Amino acid sequence: MWSSSSSLCRNPSFRRAWLSTVTVTQTAAPTSSRLAALRTQLATEEASIDDFSSTNAPTTTTHYTSSNGSPIVRQKAAPRSAKILPKPRWLKAAPATSDNYRKLRDTVRELGLATVCEEARCPNIGECWGGGEDQTATATIMIMGDTCTRGCRFCSVKTSRAPPPLDPHEPEKVATAIAQWGLDYVVLTSVDRDDLPDQGADHFRQVVTQLKLKKPSLLVEALTPDFQGNMDLVHAVATSGLDVYAHNMETVEALTPKVRDRRATYRQSLEVLRYVKTIQSDPIGTTNNHNNNNGCLTKTSLMLGLGETDDQVLTTLRDLRDADVDVVTFGQYLQPTKKHLPVQEYVTPEKFDFWQETAMGMGFAYVASGPLVRSSYKAGELFLQKYIAQKKQRNAEVAAA
């Protein structure tokens, strides 16, 4: 019964077009009539190339009936559920080309250091590693392994309930390598280690202490986990001799359960930062500490573009000032993989400027805000601005006494 149209039906392109756009029930009508009706229906359909693409086809199951009465089922591909926003032009970073950048890059590989700068493909690596006359060269080193016990929905670091054990020689090896690197400022960060009795606090402390012993002039920032809110562990790291204690809030309170691991709560992170300021009057760590007995600066970072509102950001800033946090940075959230939270908004540079002005007006000592800003962005530069101002103030007070 298909003899008069067999060559047409054997054509693959025709069969695909027919099955994706038409529901046909075979009857006993003459072949010429069926073919004429089919041509008429095809002519009235406004099919485009998207109708033949599996990524754009509708999510429907269409049932057909063959000439012998047997059912034919065609499952069309599902569309992508979340619309992917195109990246705006302001998220393009200039390539890193300076001599100092290349020197530090080669040294990192020679010494076998693991830097967040490279592993996270940070867009600011050229600025931070490049240094210059008006800023120090800065890098962020990850310690305690590359596997985290938590699974935050914005982060692409590997996760496991039982990561490999800590390397007991890491504090000495990392301190020796960094001391040889020629940096002025280093940021130490780590994965969460909820599998350890002290969550790695003593290990963190040892790395800082060894660094200060080997290179007293080196400025050290510790970007720490929340240590499950155990303030004894926070105290151990805060009094290790570091210059800046950083712990990231990441986002506003309303979005925290969605964005971060369930064990990382907004209030717990806020209390970690608050507690560090309460021990400012304690002697901090070693005699090589640059802040003497004045304590260390506290710092946190917020990602924008996750769906937060202006009122929520303002509330977070008020909470941070109430906790006496010194430094805050704002940066654009970027989805690391399709499995992670999608970007809800690409915040404009003008809006980042607004948040910088707003935060400075609220009394923060320093604010870095921009689409490509990350928590350790130009860390050495922002610390030195604060440190030099404090030093001048102390000198003026001594002279006036």
Curated annotation (Swiss-Prot):
**Where does this protein act, in terms of pathway?**
Protein modification; protein lipoylation via endogenous pathway; protein N(6)-(lipoyl)lysine from octanoyl-[acyl-carrier-protein]: step 2/2
Q: Which domain of life does this protein belong to?
A: Eukaryota
Under the heading SMART domains, the entry gives: Elp3
- Transit peptide: where? 1-25
Q: Where is the composition biased (Polar residues)?
A: 51-70
Protein residues bound to [4Fe-4S] cluster 1: 117, 122, 128, 376
Please name the InterPro entries in this protein's record. Answer: Aldolase_TIM, Elp3/MiaA/NifB-like_rSAM, LIAS_N, Lipoyl_synth, rSAM
Q: Which UniProt keywords apply?
A: 4Fe-4S, Iron, Iron-sulfur, Metal-binding, Mitochondrion, S-adenosyl-L-methionine, Transferase, Transit peptide
The protein's matches in PROSITE patterns, at most eight in alphabetical order, are given as: RADICAL_SAM
Q: Does the keyword Nucleotide-binding apply?
A: no
- Class of this enzyme: transferase
Cell membrane is among the record's keywords: no
Question: Where found in the cell?
Answer: Mitochondrion
Could you tell me what this protein is called? Answer: Lipoyl synthase 1, mitochondrial
